[in-house]
Amino acid sequence: MAPVATTFLPTASNEATLRPSFVRDEDERPRVAYNQFSDAVPVISLQGIDEAARAEIRARVAGACEEWGIFQVVDHGVDAGLVADMARLARDFFALPPEDKLRFDMSGGKKGGFIVSSHLQGEAVKDWREIVTYFSYPVKSRDYSRWPDKPAGWRAVVEQYSERLMGLACKLLGVLSEAMGLDTNALADACVDMDQKVVVNFYPKCPQPDLTLGLKRHTDPGTITLLLQDLVGGLQATRDAGKTWITVQPIPGSFVVNLGDHAHYLSNGRFKNADHQAVVNSDCCRLSIATFQNPAPDAMVYPLAVRDGEEPILEEPITFAEMYRRKMARDLELAKLKKKAKEQRQLQQAALPPPPPTQVAAELAAQKPKSLDEILA
């Protein structure tokens, strides 16, 4: 474990400006405020999903996935008390002293635990967040030595929470399978032995939120993600490749549902993979808990339904592990290229000779305010 003194934690920072490692290029910075809410993302009640309302719910879910790849669900059946306990324990964990959190430091390739910014290696710019992550399904993947032992009750609550969200995810995948004209279990079966990873995000107050992101723009690689968020706001989505962004309106008692790349491919591109990011603010902290439902590493990725007039969007079947590897390699390569281009621009600017004094004087004279006589002339 790295010494506490050498590990920067945003939750422990009282610095008035951002460290350079968190400052993003201008084209990546937020353009919409964390609390400038939009109701464009559909909110769908799951009341009656196993009864007469199923056809209507199926149509609404399919429509949301075709338009956004993201929607919110209410009346989902997950106990409100359990959700409250999960959120409380998460907040209590991030309030622990740095040395307690860093006991579970996951840097250096450890699977599960605590880290700042991201568990991905090679990122050029850090995200303004702290996370704790654990693997909960298949059950054999649970490494309790990487699960926090503080606060008290963590293990029992997160096991129950994980189980309930696995059930909700499978129910939603069943609806999407039917919308594709397939058997109810088709999407779940395509995952083979479904993985589940939970990532608890804590976004502390940020001294310069206009210069950074809590979580950079991305799509999730897996099948479906269920996000619990508090009422602060900060989740943003785009459906036009980043030209415009909206901040998703937090709704008490809801889960945000994101479709990932895997579901996008299985639907042959019919359903969008949610393009999203998280912004931060200087007023208050924000908490979110993302539960990722992913296929097994050896599950084959290929469209399950190709409609008339369509061509498969994949040339050939590949494993999910290979799909994920290609995605990460591409993202890291793009980040490296962008970093290199930025460094080259900085070197070129530093190499430019300063303007001669006569040019500076002329520019200053041009900016000098006109006299009243000149204005009225």
From Swiss-Prot:
Start and end residues of each Fe2OG dioxygenase domain: 191-295
Function: Catalyzes the 3-beta-hydroxylation of 2S-flavanones to 2R,3R-dihydroflavonols which are intermediates in the biosynthesis of flavonols, anthocyanidins, catechins and proanthocyanidins in plants. Converts (2S)-eriodictyol to (+)-taxifolin and (2S)-naringenin to (+)-(2R/3R)-dihydrokaempferol in vitro.
Protein source organism: Oryza sativa subsp. japonica
Protein name: Flavanone 3-dioxygenase 1
GO biological process, one term: response to UV-B
Cofactor binding remark: Binds 1 Fe(2+) ion per subunit.
Organism classification: Eukaryota, Viridiplantae, Streptophyta, Embryophyta, Tracheophyta
Essential cofactor(s): Fe(2+); L-ascorbate
Keywords: Dioxygenase, Flavonoid biosynthesis, Iron, Metal-binding, Oxidoreductase, Vitamin C
